[in-house]
């Protein structure tokens, strides 16, 4: 549909909890398509509605081989005590990376574009992306969850050793 402009990191929409979707209609379908188009144009792994100035709990995640995950009003039902610490970043904060500890496995409840409830169990990288994007829709940037922010040299070393 359309590639949307990203809001800057200082935009107030990114500090507030996004509103729940109550109407599952064509405007939601357009928003999901706009998120997809914008995500791919930005070469991002995921994108949520507040990042394109829409205060709605709607997000999209590129799970590569598993396809595209659409999240509408997602809620974490359970998560493992076992955690993994890994590098995270955001297109909202370019060139900022941090080590974030997150649950290794989660169960998330969400809705599809038609308003049907779906439940998904996610592990490792996909679980991390879902937790990251839900935080973002709740006004919590990954930097608030980061154990530490990395220097440019540390980020380079991460990618060389990966």
Curated annotation (Swiss-Prot):
It comes from the Bacteria. InterPro entries: Peptide_deformylase, Peptide_deformylase_sf. Transmembrane segments: none annotated. Belongs to the polypeptide deformylase family. GO terms for biological process: co-translational protein modification; translation. This is Peptide deformylase-like. NCBIfam families: pept_deformyl, PRK14595.1. GO terms for molecular function: peptide deformylase activity.
